[in-house]
């Protein structure tokens, strides 16, 4: 505390400490894959991506077999389409917990994070699309004295 400020002129002469934005670097393993974990509701997806022909495997099965509904397949493809990287990466993921919709959301979240690990410059595009944000909505717990979380038992006057 040797340098005490005596006047406002000295205060304005002080330079604020410049805080730089964090530099995002490429994070790949020894096999050239980027890894990320995605979550949605009760589902957790572990996702690995590497450059390839655009093949997507979910729990050792083709994406068309695992996610039969076209909406779920489209959901998984969204980060790749937004980043203009459709068909350029092979995706291998294992997903557990929850239902199919939650699992598709978890894979999408993990795939987005893995893309940012592989190509940090895609972070802005994916963040703008909302793919890097974990959807925190989960099922509300059941309360005592209630039929479900909020539903009351049927009222009877007599």
UniProtKB/Swiss-Prot annotation:
It comes from the Bacteria. Pfam families: Ribosomal_S9. GO terms for molecular function: RNA binding; structural constituent of ribosome. Keywords: Ribonucleoprotein, Ribosomal protein. InterPro entries: Ribosomal_Su5_D2-typ_SF, Ribosomal_uS9, Ribosomal_uS9_bac/plastid, Ribosomal_uS9_CS, Ribsml_uS5_D2-typ_fold_subgr. The keyword DNA damage does not apply. Disulfide bonds: none annotated. One of its GO terms (cellular component) is cytosolic small ribosomal subunit. GO terms for biological process: translation. HAMAP family: Ribosomal_uS9_B. Belongs to the universal ribosomal protein uS9 family. This is Small ribosomal subunit protein uS9. It comes from Nitrobacter winogradskyi (strain ATCC 25391 / DSM 10237 / CIP 104748 / NCIMB 11846 / Nb-255). The gene is rpsI.
């Amino acid at each position: 505390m040797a340098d005490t400020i005596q006047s406002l002129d000295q205060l304005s002469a002080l330079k604020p400490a410049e805080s730089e934005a964090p530099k995002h670097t490429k994070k790949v393993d020894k096999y050239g894959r980027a890894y990320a974990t995605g979550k949605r509701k009760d589902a957790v997806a572990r996702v690995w991506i590497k450059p390839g022909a655009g093949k997507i495997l979910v729990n050792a099965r083709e994406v068309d077999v695992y996610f039969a509904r076209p909406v779920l397949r489209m959901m998984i493809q969204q980060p790749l389409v937004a980043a203009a990287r459709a068909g350029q990466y092979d995706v291998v993921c294992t997903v557990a917990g929850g239902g199919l919709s939650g699992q598709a959301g978890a894979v999408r979240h993990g795939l987005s994070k893995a893309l940012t690990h592989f190509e940090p410059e895609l972070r802005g595009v994916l963040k703008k699309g909302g793919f890097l944000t974990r959807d925190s909505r989960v099922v509300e717990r059941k309360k005592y004295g209630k039929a479900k979380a909020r539903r009351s038992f049927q009222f009877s006057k007599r």
